[in-house]
């Protein structure tokens, strides 16, 4: 992987990730394909929304279908027939999400398989091996996603262990002869001094890119913005920056303003299945009765398959009847909305007009622009 940085506007960056499998224009949003599928979508449909890279889930694909089935096909690209690059998370966040059924030690994480209850152990080395078999174009280190709220002492211990796991991840990744990219993950909760230690330690180990982890886990938006403003300038400028698990459209805008290059989130697909649709002027809850006889498209400014062909009334009808097509059409639209937003951000950075784009984005939704505390 090669990262090319074209231009900046304030702290925002316009560039691209170059892989053997294709080019990803940044800032980029990555749809999430947890089980080897972006829910309800064929790879061709995902590509048609403008997505150039997707995310797969190491933890879930390890449990089902498992490494051996994956290797029978070649790798995850061959298994799911996605031709572009794939980033896989390490499984750390999913283990964090297991809560009481897991035990974290220095060696790794002991937990019970949520499918059948069998005891399982996952550590940095195993995570690197699974992601190697998946053929991931971007591999994420294995870390502990520090919960929120966490006091300073807990956050410090967690961050320090994640640093040790980062070194173990790096060593196993290298010993496998993996030629793809490996990203470090910055932890430290909402504490700037801990984030400083984490960034410094990861940069000393050396990675192809750096993710900001442990955000969007319940902390106030002001804390997320503050941490991004503090951390991003410390990440080497020639490496991509990835904000994990984020987020709402406004979170993408605010991340870009603070120097983030990559995002992923289940929100556009999950919300689509619940009839919660993103449009230029805000949000449409398609199951509400007011859409029953609305012959207008979902978003007059959207060029997606759904908006070019169907009315709000039809989408409302499909939702009320619990038709699978409704979830699919909603997903196509939400994914396209996110890709159109990213394309707009990229163009604004190129033209040096990011802040006017941001102002228009919020004004269209009747909201005020959050403060930006950067030099």
Curated annotation (Swiss-Prot):
Record note on quaternary structure: Homodimer. Within each dimer, one monomer is responsible for RNA recognition and catalysis, while the other monomer binds to the replacement base PreQ1.
Presence of keyword Zinc: yes
Chain coiled-coil ranges: none
Co-factor requirement: Zn(2+)
Domain of life where this protein originates: Bacteria
EC class (word): transferase
Protein name, as recorded: Queuine tRNA-ribosyltransferase
NCBIfam families: Q_tRNA_tgt, tgt_general
Ranges for region RNA binding: 245-251, 269-273
Reaction equation(s) it catalyzes: 7-aminomethyl-7-carbaguanine + guanosine(34) in tRNA = 7-aminomethyl-7-carbaguanosine(34) in tRNA + guanine
């Amino acid at each position: 992987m090669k990262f090319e940085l074209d231009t900046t506007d304030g702290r925002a960056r316009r560039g691209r990730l170059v892989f053997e499998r294709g080019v990803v224009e940044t800032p980029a949003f990555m749809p999430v394909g947890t089980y080897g599928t972006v829910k309800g979508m064929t790879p061709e449909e995902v590509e048609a929304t403008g997505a150039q890279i997707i995310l797969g889930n190491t933890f879930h694909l390890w449990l089902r279908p498992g490494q051996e089935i994956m290797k029978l096909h070649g790798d995850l690209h061959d298994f799911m027939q996605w031709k572009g690059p794939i980033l896989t998370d390490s499984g750390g966040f999913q283990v964090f999400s297991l809560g009481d059924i897991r035990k974290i030690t220095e060696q790794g994480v002991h937990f019970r398989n949520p499918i059948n209850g069998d005891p399982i152990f996952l550590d940095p080395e195993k995570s690197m091996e699974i992601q190697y078999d998946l053929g991931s174009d971007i591999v994420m280190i294995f870390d502990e996603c520090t919960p929120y709220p966490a006091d300073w002492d807990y956050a410090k211990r967690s961050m320090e262990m994640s640093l040790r796991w980062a070194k173990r991840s790096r060593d196993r990744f290298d010993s496998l002869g993996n030629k793809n990219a490996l990203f470090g993950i910055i932890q430290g909760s909402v504490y700037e001094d801990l984030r400083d230690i984490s960034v410094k330690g990861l940069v000393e180990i050396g990675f192809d890119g750096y993710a900001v982890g442990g955000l969007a886990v319940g902390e106030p938006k002001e804390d997320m913005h503050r941490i991004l403003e503090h951390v991003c300038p410390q990440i080497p400028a020639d490496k991509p920056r990835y904000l994990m698990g984020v987020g709402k459209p406004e979170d993408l805008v605010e991340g870009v303003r603070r120097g983030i290059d990559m995002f992923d989130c289940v929100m556009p697909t999950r919300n689509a299945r619940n009839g919660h649709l993103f449009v230029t002027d805000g949000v449409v809850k398609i199951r509400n009765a007011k859409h029953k006889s609305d012959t207008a498209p979902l978003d007059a400014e959207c060029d997606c398959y759904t908006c070019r062909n169907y009315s709000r009334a039809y989408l409302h009808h499909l939702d009320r009847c619990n038709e699978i097509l409704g979830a699919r059409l909603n997903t196509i639209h939400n994914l396209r909305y996110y890709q159109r937003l990213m394309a707009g951000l990229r163009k604004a950075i190129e033209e040096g007009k990011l802040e006017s784009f941001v102002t228009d984005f919020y004004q269209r939704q009747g909201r005020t622009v959050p403060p930006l505390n950067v030099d």
